[in-house]
Amino acid sequence: MFSEDEYRLDFFVDEGFQRKKCEKCGKFFWSRDAQRNTCGDPPCDPYTFIGSPIFKREHTLDEMREHYLSFFQARGHARIQRYPVVARWRDDIYLTIASIADFQPFVTSGQVPPPANPLTISQPCIRLDDLDSVGRSGRHLTTFEMMAHHVFNTREREIYWKDRTVRLCDELLAGLGMDPLAVTY
């Protein structure tokens, strides 16, 4: 387990977050809401966004994809094209199950450079490992689009790490109109 210092980011201090312990699961989390007692993750808190959007307005898939990619592009990330959903470059998986799978093992091992660094992508994914759970909640899907931003740091060159990652996430959510008190990390 990592120490508290590993998670005490400048961003959390700058933005007035408090480190709290979830009263249900016992895990630690960060929140701006002094009254919050739970981490926000299921099963500690139910899904509340289904049928009740958390942003200022509803977005179509195309609008959300464009907003996300444009957000990161405006902050120095190259927009790259999606990879195939059949992971032909892999011998350990058949389908692209996550955006990072696009870059494994060759980029993540350092064998080849990334197509851009940093980058943003909206990757169609297929997962079949929890078919029995599909439809029970908004959590289990067979196909989805994983919008991601990736940075490939090396010992010689660190582009950014945890603090900037969380800052970007928070800025994206705020720009979409999410209540900052509802956000937990």
Describe the predicted segments one by one.
Residues K27-F28, I159:
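Short, low-complexity intrinsically disordered segments
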Residues R19-E23, C169:
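Short, solvent-exposed secondary-structure boundary motifs
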Residues M1-D5:
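Basic, low-complexity terminal or inter-domain segments flanking catalytic cores
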Residues E6-R8, H67:
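Long, compositionally biased low-complexity segments enriched in polar/charged residues
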Residues L9-F17, F28-D33:
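Short, flexible, mixed-charge glycine/proline-rich loop motifs
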Residues C22-C25, C39:
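Short cysteine-rich clusters marking metal-coordination/redox-active sites
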Residues F49-Y185:
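Structured aminoacyl-transfer and RNA-binding surfaces used for tRNA recognition/handling
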Residues D33-Y47:
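Cysteine-rich micro-motifs
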